[in-house]
From Swiss-Prot:
<feature type="binding site">
    <location>
        <begin position="100"/>
        <end position="102"/>
    </location>
    <ligand>
        <name>ATP</name>
    </ligand>
</feature>
<dbReference type="InterPro" id="IPR004364">
    <property type="entry name" value="Aa-tRNA-synt_II"/>
</dbReference>
<comment type="similarity">
    <text>Belongs to the class-II aminoacyl-tRNA synthetase family. EpmA subfamily.</text>
</comment>
<dbReference type="Pfam" id="PF00152">
    <property type="entry name" value="tRNA-synt_2"/>
</dbReference>
<comment type="subunit">
    <text>Homodimer.</text>
</comment>
<feature type="binding site">
    <location>
        <position position="118"/>
    </location>
    <ligand>
        <name>substrate</name>
    </ligand>
</feature>
<feature type="binding site">
    <location>
        <position position="300"/>
    </location>
    <ligand>
        <name>ATP</name>
    </ligand>
</feature>
<protein>
    <recommendedName>
        <fullName>Elongation factor P--(R)-beta-lysine ligase</fullName>
        <ecNumber>6.3.2.-</ecNumber>
    </recommendedName>
</protein>
<dbReference type="InterPro" id="IPR045864">
    <property type="entry name" value="aa-tRNA-synth_II/BPL/LPL"/>
</dbReference>
<dbReference type="GO" id="GO:0016880">
    <property type="term" value="F:acid-ammonia (or amide) ligase activity"/>
</dbReference>
<dbReference type="InterPro" id="IPR006195">
    <property type="entry name" value="aa-tRNA-synth_II"/>
</dbReference>
<feature type="binding site">
    <location>
        <begin position="76"/>
        <end position="78"/>
    </location>
    <ligand>
        <name>substrate</name>
    </ligand>
</feature>
<feature type="binding site">
    <location>
        <begin position="244"/>
        <end position="245"/>
    </location>
    <ligand>
        <name>ATP</name>
    </ligand>
</feature>
<dbReference type="GO" id="GO:0006430">
    <property type="term" value="P:lysyl-tRNA aminoacylation"/>
</dbReference>
<comment type="function">
    <text>With EpmB is involved in the beta-lysylation step of the post-translational modification of translation elongation factor P (EF-P). Catalyzes the ATP-dependent activation of (R)-beta-lysine produced by EpmB, forming a lysyl-adenylate, from which the beta-lysyl moiety is then transferred to the epsilon-amino group of a conserved specific lysine residue in EF-P.</text>
</comment>
<keyword id="KW-0067">ATP-binding</keyword>
<dbReference type="InterPro" id="IPR004525">
    <property type="entry name" value="EpmA"/>
</dbReference>
Length: 325
């Protein structure tokens, strides 16, 4: 397909037909298990505080907002879905568009399809089993292997990620020819993520999916800290064929602790000369009201379809990638 034919779809129609069938499979998977399908807003007055996520921002001008109401396109439906959980929805799932003002390329598009679901009274391990069931059904792959973050990082990078200081992480980055990228980072977690992405991820999940669990507590985000080891969080990620597919948590339900994490993120943002982000007070109010103990996971549907079709890049399975949108 020539670049001059930019009106045409990025993906072959045959792939879009197969994609539609896979999305139908996903819906049946959850409806057969009794989960409620929901739709939540694509925009919000609040957004994520995570220093590694960049949301799109717009402004609503209308009744009651003549001066302009800042709105953010959602990077995931998580906050609204948790409000539904607190309101008594029970187990629920959603297939929706999410938006991140970041990369575009082989595995990224600023607008993408997210599958997210939440299971009240599931722990992290039980939810990992359900993710594994879904991957086996859609990808016709073997059951996943499970590895702790500490185990897989130590094996491939050569140092313990839970005890290494910034200097040791920088030295490891130099050893792996990542010194230039590491030299501009002053945040320990960013160095950990650099080493994990560049050294660990390429070496796991080749023949079958790999679940990595118990990420460092400093990367807990919205996850509970493990009761087994306070150095780690009850968080997991799923990888296959060198691609990150899913990110799941045993969800934090303590509103006070969640506020502290949001505020800590914003302090980091200020230190990095990034803009502070508005905290989602509605989410915190829902947590304070009482969200059931649960686990939840977000999965990239475009990447899942790409793997199912053995496609080379996301644009092979998206009707119109960003360069043709």
């Amino acid at each position: 397909m020539s670049d001059s034919a930019s009106w045409q779809p990025s993906a072959p129609i045959a792939n879009l037909l197969k994609r539609a069938a896979i999305v139908g499979q996903i819906r049946r998977f959850f409806s057969d298990r009794g989960l409620l399908e929901v739709e939540t807003p694509a925009m919000s007055q609040a957004t994520v505080t995570d220093i590694h996520l960049v949301p799109f921002q717009t402004c609503f001008i209308g009744p009651g907002a003549a001066g302009g109401m800042p709105l953010y396109l959602m990077t995931s439906p998580e906050y609204h879905m948790k409000r539904l959980l607190a309101a008594g929805s029970g187990p629920l799932f959603q297939l929706c568009r999410s938006f991140r003002n970041e990369e575009a390329g082989r595995y990224h598009n600023p607008e993408f399809t997210m599958l997210e679901w939440y299971r009240p009274h599931y722990d992290m391990y039980r939810l990992m089993n359900e993710v594994d069931d879904l991957l086996q059904q859609i990808l016709d792959c073997d059951s996943a292997e499970t590895l702790s973050y500490q185990q897989v990082f130590t094996r491939h990078v050569g140092i313990d990620p839970l005890s290494a200081d910034k200097a040791q992480l920088y030295d490891a980055a130099v050893k792996w020819d990542l010194g230039e990228a590491a030299s501009v980072e002053d945040d320990r977690d960013t160095l950990l993520q650099l080493l994990f992405a560049m050294v660990v991820e390429p070496n796991i999940g080749h023949d079958k999916p790999a679940f990595v669990y118990h990420f460092p507590a400093s990367q807990a985000a919205l996850a509970e800290i493990s009761t087994e080891d306070h150095r780690v969080a009850d968080r997991f990620e799923a990888y296959f064929k060198g691609i990150e597919l899913a990110n799941g948590f045993c969800e934090l339900t303590d509103a006070r602790e969640q506020r502290q994490r949001f505020e800590q993120d914003n302090r980091k943002r200020v230190a990095m000369k990034l803009s502070e982000q508005p905290i989602d007070e509605n989410l915190l109010a829902a947590l304070a009201q009482g969200m059931p103990e649960c686990s939840g996971v977000a999965l990239g549907v475009d990447r899942l379809v790409m793997l199912a079709l053995k496609a080379d890049r996301l644009s092979d399975v998206i009707a119109f990638a960003v360069e043709r949108a």
